Amino acid sequence: MEQTQDGGNLSGVHHIILVLSGKGGVGKSTISTEIALALRHAGKKVGILDVDLCGPSIPRMLNAQSKDVHQCDSGWVPVYVDQEKSISLMSIGFLLEKPDDAVVWRGPKKNALIKQFVSDVAWGDLDFLIIDTPPGTSDEHISTVDALRPFNPMGALLVTTPQAVSVGDVRRELTFCKKTGLRVIGIVENMSGYVCPHCTECTNIFSKGGGEELARLSGVPFLGCVPLDPLLSQSLEQGKDLMQEFPNSAAYPAISSITRQILDMASPQS
């Protein structure tokens, strides 16, 4: 257990991972979703907390957008994505009257909901809780880190794309982690090359190696590259499990490798 005190609704959660990105559109929610699915295939019980309040996309990625959140004595009961109840999900997307409603809130109201999400969701026993955060470094990130600090999170996973502008934003994310005392468990480079669906050749549309070079210079682990893969996009659009439905996907081995490294890091703490 990572918690050092009675954690209330988080007392049964063994490892907490925050997924961060310096800018929007780098596939942070995609990586959060795929790692959660891969952890489930490794026999782990996983929760996903979607605190990207203005862009809650994970319910759709897991084909759970039509499900409802219920109340219990301990607070909110998360939505279970599968029949085995091995993946549970909480998102503001479940609390909106209409899926297309915009969240037009000022900072204090957002921060209050984040704190409520951290304290009032009845997760039960989980091996991993993955927290999908908004892009950038804002009030919401500070509120999330502060609310989780008593529970000693495993650390932050930083997602970037190969372009220099994205890598530069991740540098600021590294500074944020350092200032808030949040351990960085690794960097993932997403959209790293395009895999042709016909010949499976990988072409570097943007560039390559920016995330790995940043990890080397910063002294943090580089967990791997995930290519642009039409099958990965298809699985997310259809709300399907990539590893189950598309085992020949080019992204499959990359996601599997990243997940194995996370499991290896977590095992000494279990």
UniProtKB/Swiss-Prot annotation:
Annotated keywords: 4Fe-4S, ATP-binding, Cytoplasm, Iron, Iron-sulfur, Metal-binding, Nucleotide-binding
Cofactor: [4Fe-4S] cluster
Domain of life: Eukaryota
Binding site for ATP: 22-29
GO biological process terms, semicolon-separated: iron-sulfur cluster assembly
Entry-linked Pfam families: ParA (PF10609)
Oligomer and partners: Heterotetramer of 2 nubp1 and 2 nubp2 chains.
Role this protein plays: Component of the cytosolic iron-sulfur (Fe/S) protein assembly (CIA) machinery. Required for maturation of extramitochondrial Fe-S proteins. The nubp1-nubp2 heterotetramer forms a Fe-S scaffold complex, mediating the de novo assembly of an Fe-S cluster and its transfer to target apoproteins.
Protein name, per record: Cytosolic Fe-S cluster assembly factor nubp2
Source organism of this protein record: Xenopus laevis (African clawed frog)
Lineage, uppermost ranks: Eukaryota, Metazoa, Chordata, Craniata, Vertebrata
